[in-house]
Amino acid sequence: MKTTTQIVHLLCAFCVVCFCIIQIFMKIRRPNMQELHQEVDEFVPDSCTKKMPKIGISANRNSEFQSCIAEQYVQAVLKAGGAPVLIPVITDIAALTAVVDSLDGLLMSGGADINPLYLNEEPIPQLQDVDTYRDEFDLMLIRLAANRQIPIMGICRGHQLMNAAFGGTLYQDIYSQHNEPVLKHSQKMPRNQASHSVTLEDGRKIGVNSIHHQSVAKLAQEFVETAVAPDGINEGMRHQEKYIFSVQWHPEHLTDDSEPYSLQLFQKLIKYAELYSRAKDLHNRIVTIDSHTDTPMIFPGEFNLGKKEGGKVNLPYMEEGKIDAVFMVAYIPQGKRDDESLDAARNLAINRINEIKRQEKINPSRMGIAYSTEDLLHLKRQNKKAVFIGIENGYALGKNLQNISMFKEMGVSYITLCHNGDNDICDSARGKGEWGGLSPFGKEVVAEMNRLGIMIDLSHAAESTFYDVLECSTAPVIASHSSVRSLCDHPRNLTDEQLKAIARKGGVVQLCLYKGFINKDSEKASLSDAIRHLEYMINLIGIDHVGIGSDFDGDGELIGCRSTNELINITMRLLELGYSDSDIEKIWGGNLLRVMKEVQGERNQVN
């Protein structure tokens, strides 16, 4: 039996060996201040090398409640090509927001059990140590990053916490709560050795390490299982549409050449972070516009765009998603056409426009009302968001051409000629064909809108109306929120011939994100479906005639793109598909602004 002295000597020798290994692992060199300063001062980044994306790593807390992280997380991020940044465990939202705003990607690390109270569950006896303060920190991080569409990767506890944050459930203890016989998931062997297999989404089997007793029970909505253990325990997931994924094992310990999949996980995070970094930079340089939102419709009284008050479009969302401008429309539902009803429709439009304009008064440091391209560019230089004004449904005009001048003076940039029903101007795509296209009054409306420099919006119009307008209008037209009928057979969508006709006229078609116009199975409508519509239009009519008109707050939303802060996901997809910065600039507003300038220039020529 070894004496106490021998044991101490052995421990000291072990510590020396560990210290030497760590020095080699971390490349610690002989201390020399002069050489160190010289190396730093002479370093010049290679202009041909991609910028390293900044990856925030959520810190753990040790027994003394100090923020710390295992070195393997840092080295794995470095090896994959990222610049790791440790995020200390704090719960000051303002400070965390400042940190998250600087990131390109987020890595949620492992650690202790999760407090079940966050999932509205009482603790069971098998629950082990929890750190509720760290839970709060991690959940804040996930929420802040997800709101900004920052790519997120989770590991072990991070995997479980992400599932909980997005609405899934957890086993507090798999050994007592999982119905089937369970493997040993808390290995005693070194973490750089695999202890059991998992089956991946593509059917491959790989070996993984396993250090946990909690796990995902029910996957969060919109997530797909990407790995499963032989006992049925979930080992990995990804969001259907967003750049978010996680695994139950610890791949940071398995990044050698023996199992490439673990390193590939970190490389995936870096790839996604590079896309996000490029998208952020691009949105900062170009002008981004959503050409159709119905936000004023959802508020029964006064509202404040400066707050997140329940809608899908507001200034915080625009700031998070780096969207410069939105068109907010005064939506007027089609009603009766007697004088009293027409007056009521006009007054509703006036009230909604005034409520839009009031937003500038209550948020003067964050936004302004824009009436032209120049206004928008001026606001962007001031770091403010822009709101353009539109009217959805010419029903608001009644039978009086003078109303067009009045709305022009109020700042209206476009008018959608009709909505779901024929009116005194024209036939609707959902109407009864009352006029066979434009009415006589409708032809006067087109001429007057041309004269005043108001864009004509053909979304919702019947095909007969559509072609009548193209024949009568002297200026290009827009479809502020329309999709492709060849991909989703809906009367509101545009045929290939209609798409081509708008392009020939010099106009632009703004892709609508309403799920019923994107996929016949509307509940499955996704960002991927929208990208297919967008690419279809680009291939058919060219990059110069397409844009984005979300229809948010008018039922527009898709899996992967449900509100203004999520629109940057479109940019990331387009970058991933290989579209150039100049192409994306056209899609995000360049094309629409070209048409607006031409239409407003048409007014100047006439006048």
Feature map (PLM): residue ranges:
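Proline-centered loop/turn at the N-terminus of a beta-strand
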Residues: 53-54, 83, 151, 169, ...
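Histidine-centered catalytic micro-motifs
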Residues: 208-215, 246-251, 288-295, 412, ...
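N-terminal hydrophobic targeting/anchoring segments and the immediately downstream early-domain regions
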Residues: 278-434, 489-499, 503-548, 552-607
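Redox-cofactor binding/interface segments in oxidoreductases and associated redox assembly factors
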Residues: 57, 107-108, 328, 417, ...
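N-terminal beta1-alpha1 cap of cysteine-dependent amidohydrolase-like domains
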Residues: 3, 9-13, 18-155, 164, ...
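Divalent metal-binding pocket/active-site signature
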Residues: 396-398, 409-492
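Structural motif
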Residues: 80, 109, 148, 165, ...
